[in-house]
Regions:
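His-Asp-centered metal-binding catalytic motifs of divalent-metal-dependent phosphohydrolases/nucleases
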Residues: 84-102, 108, 112, 133-142
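Active-site metal-coordination segments of metallo-dependent hydrolases
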Residues: 56-65, 100-111, 126
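Acidic/histidine metal-binding catalytic segments
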Residues: 63, 80-86, 123-136
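Glycine-rich, flexible beta-strand/loop modules in the N-terminal catalytic cores of phosphate-handling
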Residues: 31-33, 45-48
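Short helix-capping and hinge/turn segments at secondary-structure transitions, especially at repeat
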Residues: 76, 97-101, 117-125, 138-145
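Short coil-to-beta-strand
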Residues: 38-44, 82-91
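Divalent metal-dependent phosphate-bond-processing catalytic cores, especially two-metal-ion Mg2+/Mn2+ enzymes
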Residues: 1-35, 53, 57-80, 124, ...
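An active-site-proximal "capping" alpha-helix that borders the catalytic cofactor pocket
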Residues: 67-69, 107-122
Length: 228
Protein backbone atom coordinates (compact mmCIF):
# COMPACT_ATOMS: atom_id res chain seq x y z
CA UNK A 1 0.00 0.00 0.00
CA UNK A 2 1.36 3.43 -0.98
CA UNK A 3 0.39 6.12 1.50
CA UNK A 4 -0.53 9.64 0.45
CA UNK A 5 2.74 11.02 1.87
CA UNK A 6 4.46 9.39 -1.11
CA UNK A 7 2.42 11.67 -3.35
CA UNK A 8 3.74 14.72 -1.50
CA UNK A 9 7.27 13.51 -2.13
CA UNK A 10 6.47 12.70 -5.75
CA UNK A 11 4.82 16.01 -6.55
CA UNK A 12 7.21 17.93 -4.32
CA UNK A 13 10.04 16.79 -6.55
CA UNK A 14 8.16 18.36 -9.44
CA UNK A 15 7.78 21.63 -7.48
CA UNK A 16 4.01 21.30 -7.27
CA UNK A 17 2.06 22.89 -4.45
CA UNK A 18 0.08 19.74 -3.72
CA UNK A 19 -1.78 20.99 -0.66
CA UNK A 20 -2.71 24.25 -2.33
CA UNK A 21 -3.77 22.49 -5.51
CA UNK A 22 -5.95 20.03 -3.64
CA UNK A 23 -7.49 22.76 -1.54
CA UNK A 24 -8.38 24.75 -4.64
CA UNK A 25 -9.57 21.79 -6.66
CA UNK A 26 -13.21 22.18 -5.70
CA UNK A 27 -13.16 25.76 -4.48
CA UNK A 28 -16.11 27.89 -5.48
CA UNK A 29 -15.06 30.16 -8.30
CA UNK A 30 -11.72 28.47 -8.80
CA UNK A 31 -10.41 28.81 -12.38
CA UNK A 32 -10.76 25.74 -14.65
CA UNK A 33 -7.13 24.65 -14.36
CA UNK A 34 -7.25 24.88 -10.56
CA UNK A 35 -10.44 22.83 -10.40
CA UNK A 36 -8.70 20.23 -12.55
CA UNK A 37 -5.57 20.24 -10.39
CA UNK A 38 -6.67 17.34 -8.18
CA UNK A 39 -5.12 14.20 -9.62
CA UNK A 40 -6.72 10.79 -8.99
CA UNK A 41 -5.49 9.47 -5.64
CA UNK A 42 -6.62 5.85 -5.82
CA UNK A 43 -4.21 3.17 -4.56
CA UNK A 44 -3.31 2.37 -8.17
CA UNK A 45 -2.60 6.02 -8.98
CA UNK A 46 -0.36 6.44 -5.94
CA UNK A 47 1.47 3.18 -6.63
CA UNK A 48 2.03 4.23 -10.23
CA UNK A 49 3.42 7.59 -9.17
CA UNK A 50 5.90 5.87 -6.86
CA UNK A 51 6.87 3.42 -9.60
CA UNK A 52 7.39 6.16 -12.19
CA UNK A 53 9.47 8.22 -9.79
CA UNK A 54 11.79 5.22 -9.39
CA UNK A 55 12.31 4.57 -13.10
CA UNK A 56 12.01 7.95 -14.85
CA UNK A 57 13.22 11.54 -14.64
CA UNK A 58 11.53 14.78 -13.64
CA UNK A 59 11.22 16.11 -17.19
CA UNK A 60 9.46 12.98 -18.41
CA UNK A 61 7.21 12.79 -15.35
CA UNK A 62 6.09 16.37 -15.88
CA UNK A 63 5.29 15.55 -19.51
CA UNK A 64 3.20 12.60 -18.35
CA UNK A 65 1.18 14.68 -15.90
CA UNK A 66 0.65 17.47 -18.43
CA UNK A 67 -0.55 14.78 -20.85
CA UNK A 68 -3.23 13.86 -18.31
CA UNK A 69 -4.16 17.47 -17.59
CA UNK A 70 -4.53 18.39 -21.26
CA UNK A 71 -6.27 15.12 -22.10
CA UNK A 72 -8.75 15.46 -19.26
CA UNK A 73 -9.62 19.06 -20.10
CA UNK A 74 -10.00 18.31 -23.81
CA UNK A 75 -12.26 15.37 -22.97
CA UNK A 76 -14.37 17.65 -20.80
CA UNK A 77 -14.64 20.20 -23.61
CA UNK A 78 -15.80 17.46 -25.98
CA UNK A 79 -18.34 16.09 -23.51
CA UNK A 80 -16.44 12.80 -23.25
CA UNK A 81 -16.35 10.97 -19.94
CA UNK A 82 -13.18 8.88 -19.64
CA UNK A 83 -12.45 6.82 -16.57
CA UNK A 84 -10.07 9.26 -14.90
CA UNK A 85 -8.13 6.58 -13.05
CA UNK A 86 -7.43 4.74 -16.30
CA UNK A 87 -6.55 7.98 -18.10
CA UNK A 88 -4.21 9.12 -15.32
CA UNK A 89 -2.38 5.82 -14.91
CA UNK A 90 -2.07 5.43 -18.70
CA UNK A 91 -0.75 8.99 -18.94
CA UNK A 92 1.87 8.31 -16.28
CA UNK A 93 3.05 5.13 -18.00
CA UNK A 94 2.54 5.94 -21.69
CA UNK A 95 6.24 6.50 -22.46
CA UNK A 96 7.55 3.70 -20.25
CA UNK A 97 8.96 1.94 -23.31
CA UNK A 98 11.32 4.87 -23.89
CA UNK A 99 13.06 4.23 -20.58
CA UNK A 100 16.29 2.25 -20.98
CA UNK A 101 15.13 -0.20 -18.32
CA UNK A 102 12.19 -1.30 -20.48
CA UNK A 103 13.58 -0.80 -23.99
CA UNK A 104 14.17 -3.66 -26.38
CA UNK A 105 13.94 -4.65 -30.05
CA UNK A 106 10.19 -4.06 -30.37
CA UNK A 107 8.33 -0.77 -30.80
CA UNK A 108 8.53 1.32 -27.65
CA UNK A 109 4.74 1.53 -27.52
CA UNK A 110 4.43 -2.26 -27.35
CA UNK A 111 7.21 -2.56 -24.80
CA UNK A 112 5.66 0.15 -22.65
CA UNK A 113 2.22 -1.43 -22.83
CA UNK A 114 3.64 -4.78 -21.76
CA UNK A 115 5.66 -3.27 -18.91
CA UNK A 116 2.66 -1.27 -17.69
CA UNK A 117 0.43 -4.35 -17.75
CA UNK A 118 3.01 -6.38 -15.85
CA UNK A 119 3.46 -3.66 -13.21
CA UNK A 120 -0.27 -3.18 -12.65
CA UNK A 121 -0.91 -6.92 -12.52
CA UNK A 122 1.97 -7.50 -10.09
CA UNK A 123 0.59 -4.71 -7.86
CA UNK A 124 -2.86 -6.29 -7.87
CA UNK A 125 -4.55 -3.59 -9.97
CA UNK A 126 -5.91 -6.08 -12.49
CA UNK A 127 -8.87 -3.89 -13.44
CA UNK A 128 -6.44 -1.38 -14.95
CA UNK A 129 -3.94 -3.70 -16.61
CA UNK A 130 -5.75 -4.30 -19.89
CA UNK A 131 -7.30 -0.85 -20.53
CA UNK A 132 -4.07 0.96 -19.65
CA UNK A 133 -1.99 -1.34 -21.86
CA UNK A 134 -4.46 -0.94 -24.72
CA UNK A 135 -4.24 2.85 -24.54
CA UNK A 136 -0.44 2.89 -24.38
CA UNK A 137 0.06 0.49 -27.28
CA UNK A 138 -1.63 2.74 -29.86
CA UNK A 139 -1.12 6.21 -28.39
CA UNK A 140 1.18 7.39 -31.21
CA UNK A 141 -1.22 6.49 -34.02
CA UNK A 142 -3.14 9.48 -35.38
CA UNK A 143 -6.36 7.51 -35.82
CA UNK A 144 -6.37 6.75 -32.09
CA UNK A 145 -7.89 10.19 -31.49
CA UNK A 146 -11.12 8.75 -32.93
CA UNK A 147 -11.10 5.60 -30.81
CA UNK A 148 -14.52 5.00 -29.19
CA UNK A 149 -12.85 4.32 -25.84
CA UNK A 150 -12.39 7.81 -24.32
CA UNK A 151 -9.43 6.78 -22.17
CA UNK A 152 -7.61 5.54 -25.26
CA UNK A 153 -8.53 8.56 -27.38
CA UNK A 154 -7.68 11.21 -24.80
CA UNK A 155 -4.37 9.67 -23.83
CA UNK A 156 -3.32 10.08 -27.47
CA UNK A 157 -4.87 13.54 -27.72
CA UNK A 158 -3.33 14.76 -24.45
CA UNK A 159 0.13 13.46 -25.34
CA UNK A 160 0.05 15.04 -28.80
CA UNK A 161 -1.14 18.31 -27.29
CA UNK A 162 1.81 18.44 -24.91
CA UNK A 163 4.35 17.33 -27.52
CA UNK A 164 3.27 19.36 -30.55
CA UNK A 165 0.68 21.83 -29.29
CA UNK A 166 -2.15 20.17 -31.24
CA UNK A 167 -5.57 21.47 -30.07
CA UNK A 168 -3.89 24.01 -27.81
CA UNK A 169 -6.07 26.67 -29.42
CA UNK A 170 -9.01 25.20 -27.50
CA UNK A 171 -7.61 26.59 -24.25
CA UNK A 172 -7.57 30.09 -22.87
CA UNK A 173 -3.94 31.27 -22.54
CA UNK A 174 -4.20 31.43 -18.75
CA UNK A 175 -5.15 27.74 -18.54
CA UNK A 176 -2.03 26.77 -20.49
CA UNK A 177 0.07 29.10 -18.35
CA UNK A 178 -1.28 27.57 -15.14
CA UNK A 179 -0.57 24.00 -16.24
CA UNK A 180 2.93 24.82 -17.46
CA UNK A 181 3.69 26.83 -14.32
CA UNK A 182 2.66 23.88 -12.16
CA UNK A 183 4.55 21.32 -14.26
CA UNK A 184 7.38 23.27 -15.97
CA UNK A 185 8.53 22.32 -19.46
CA UNK A 186 12.27 22.96 -19.15
CA UNK A 187 14.09 20.37 -21.22
CA UNK A 188 10.94 18.74 -22.60
CA UNK A 189 11.61 19.37 -26.29
CA UNK A 190 15.26 18.32 -26.05
CA UNK A 191 14.34 15.13 -24.20
CA UNK A 192 11.58 14.06 -26.58
CA UNK A 193 13.60 14.83 -29.71
CA UNK A 194 16.56 12.85 -28.34
CA UNK A 195 14.43 9.88 -27.31
CA UNK A 196 12.67 9.70 -30.67
CA UNK A 197 15.95 10.06 -32.56
CA UNK A 198 17.37 7.15 -30.59
CA UNK A 199 14.38 4.96 -31.35
CA UNK A 200 14.64 5.74 -35.07
CA UNK A 201 18.38 5.04 -35.09
CA UNK A 202 18.24 1.67 -33.36
CA UNK A 203 14.86 0.54 -34.76
CA UNK A 204 14.58 1.84 -38.33
CA UNK A 205 11.56 -0.42 -38.98
CA UNK A 206 9.65 0.72 -35.89
CA UNK A 207 6.31 2.49 -35.82
CA UNK A 208 7.89 5.79 -34.76
CA UNK A 209 10.44 5.49 -37.59
CA UNK A 210 7.62 5.01 -40.09
CA UNK A 211 5.86 8.09 -38.72
CA UNK A 212 9.11 10.06 -38.97
CA UNK A 213 9.49 9.01 -42.61
CA UNK A 214 6.25 10.86 -43.38
CA UNK A 215 6.41 13.72 -40.89
CA UNK A 216 9.36 15.74 -39.60
CA UNK A 217 8.75 14.72 -36.01
CA UNK A 218 11.68 16.69 -34.59
CA UNK A 219 10.45 19.87 -36.27
CA UNK A 220 6.91 19.27 -35.00
CA UNK A 221 8.26 19.01 -31.46
CA UNK A 222 10.63 21.98 -31.80
CA UNK A 223 7.91 24.17 -33.31
CA UNK A 224 5.34 23.46 -30.60
CA UNK A 225 4.11 26.79 -29.18
CA UNK A 226 5.81 26.28 -25.83
CA UNK A 227 9.01 27.83 -24.53
CA UNK A 228 10.64 24.55 -23.55
Amino acid sequence: MICVCHRCTFLGALKVGTTKARGEAHAVGAPPAARDAALPDTPAALATEAFLAAVSNVTMIRHCIRTYRFGRLLAEKAGAKPDLEVLYVASLLHDLGLETLFDGPEDFEQLGARAAKRFLSDEGHWHLADPVAAAIEIHTQLETANDPRPEVAYLAIGALCDVTGARLDQFAPRVIQEIVAEYPREGTKDLIVALIARQIAIKPQSNIARIASRVDVAAAVRNAPFAG
